[in-house]
């Protein structure tokens, strides 16, 4: 103990100024655990600038950063889930829906928008994984069919960003029926000669991967995305064999021909726009910086609290 500490009590030795860091300014990469400035991460489309790990992205933000500004019209937002079976497990289905809606800010697990990407008309939809694991229920199926119908009506392509754990067990057979319903809708789109591009993000599993996600004219995976039907442990217990490392990652699927390409999220707008233009006989879109988000806004660093 120093001579000063002997004279003064520690309780009386305080800092003249107490600084505080506002919430939401910093975050940590879920892969490399690097501490990141959140505004920089947002500008980088939530891809870690240190290790290129693709973090999970909110459905609405994904569509807003993918589609051109001023061209977006949401479809099917009036559709809301209903508890027709009065389902109850450890909680009532109604309670789970209310909690998911509050946590995610969405009415259900799929967001659909009509717009354009680099000037190429498209209908785009994205799964919201934070809404009950992106599970597919009646509203998800209905909104996806609405997206297909809009693509047919406007004679344009359809793209879907999948992020789902599969069918929603609380809706039982009505949920499983959405696998057939969405697949039949995509058949109608194909009959019209219109393209469907499926982008599988982390994770795309269960009934979604077994239906609409794998039915693209072109199937794209984001880097290191988990894509499959059943989980690794379930499969190993069934076949009683040890499976290869990373066998459900997009790189493994590309190597074995299950998907067509892997595209970095920052390159997605340019790549998809070029594919859609070629598949619909339109002029190739202008090449732009892949880091330009269409709704980029300046970010001011909040001042630290000066009260001490």
UniProtKB/Swiss-Prot annotation:
Component of the acetyl coenzyme A carboxylase (ACC) complex. Biotin carboxylase (BC) catalyzes the carboxylation of biotin on its carrier protein (BCCP) and then the CO(2) group is transferred by the transcarboxylase to acetyl-CoA to form malonyl-CoA. One of its GO terms (molecular function) is ATP binding. InterPro entries: AcCoA_carboxyl_beta, Acetyl_CoA_COase_Trfase_b_su, ClpP/crotonase-like_dom_sf, COA_CT_N, Znf-ACC. Its EC number is 2.1.3.15. Belongs to the AccD/PCCB family. Binds 1 zinc ion per subunit. It catalyses: N(6)-carboxybiotinyl-L-lysyl-[protein] + acetyl-CoA = N(6)-biotinyl-L-lysyl-[protein] + malonyl-CoA. Residues 25-294 form the CoA carboxyltransferase N-terminal domain. A zinc finger (C4-type) spans 29-51. The keyword Lipid metabolism applies. Pfam families: Carboxyl_trans, Zn_ribbon_ACC. Keywords: ATP-binding, Cytoplasm, Fatty acid biosynthesis, Fatty acid metabolism, Lipid biosynthesis, Lipid metabolism, Metal-binding, Nucleotide-binding, Transferase, Zinc, Zinc-finger. It is found in: Cytoplasm. It comes from Vibrio cholerae serotype O1 (strain ATCC 39315 / El Tor Inaba N16961). One of its GO terms (cellular component) is acetate CoA-transferase complex. Pathway: Lipid metabolism; malonyl-CoA biosynthesis; malonyl-CoA from acetyl-CoA: step 1/1. Zn(2+) binds at residues 29, 32, 48, 51. This is Acetyl-coenzyme A carboxylase carboxyl transferase subunit beta. Its cofactor is Zn(2+). One of its GO terms (biological process) is fatty acid biosynthetic process. It is an enzyme of class 2 (transferase). Acetyl-CoA carboxylase is a heterohexamer composed of biotin carboxyl carrier protein (AccB), biotin carboxylase (AccC) and two subunits each of ACCase subunit alpha (AccA) and ACCase subunit beta (AccD).
């Amino acid at each position: 103990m120093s001579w000063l500490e002997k004279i003064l009590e520690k309780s009386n030795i305080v800092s003249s100024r107490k600084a505080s860091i506002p919430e939401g300014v910093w975050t940590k990469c879920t892969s490399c655990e690097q501490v990141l400035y959140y505004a920089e991460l947002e500008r980088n489309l939530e891809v870690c600038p240190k290790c290129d790990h693709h973090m999970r992205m909110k459905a609405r933000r994904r569509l807003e950063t993918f589609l051109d500004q001023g061209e977006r019209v949401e479809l099917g937002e009036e559709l809301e889930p209903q508890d027709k079976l009065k389902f109850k497990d450890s909680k009532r289905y109604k309670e789970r829906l209310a909690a998911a809606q509050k946590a995610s800010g969405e009415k259900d697990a799929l967001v659909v928008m009509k717009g354009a990407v680099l000037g190429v008309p498209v209908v785009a939809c994205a799964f919201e994984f934070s809404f009950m694991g992106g599970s597919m229920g009646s509203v998800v199926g209905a909104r996806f069919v609405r997206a297909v119908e809009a693509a047919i009506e406007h004679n344009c392509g359809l793209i879907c960003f999948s992020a789902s754990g599969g069918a929603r067990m609380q809706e039982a057979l009505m949920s499983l029926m959405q696998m057939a319903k969405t697949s039949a809708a995509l058949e109608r789109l194909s009959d019209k000669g219109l393209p469907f591009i499926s982008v599988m993000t982390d994770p795309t599993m269960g009934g979604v991967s077994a239906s609409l996600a794998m039915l693209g004219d072109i199937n794209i995976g984001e880097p290191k995305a988990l894509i499959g039907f059943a989980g690794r442990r379930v499969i190993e217990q069934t076949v009683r064999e040890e499976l290869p490392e990373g066998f459900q990652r997009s790189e493994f699927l590309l190597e074995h021909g299950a998907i067509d390409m892997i595209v970095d999220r920052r390159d997605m707008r340019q790549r998809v726009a070029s594919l859609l233009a070629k598949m619909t006989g339109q002029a190739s879109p202008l090449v732009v910086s892949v880091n330009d988000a269409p709704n980029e806004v300046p970010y001011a660093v909040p001042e630290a609290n000066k009260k001490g």
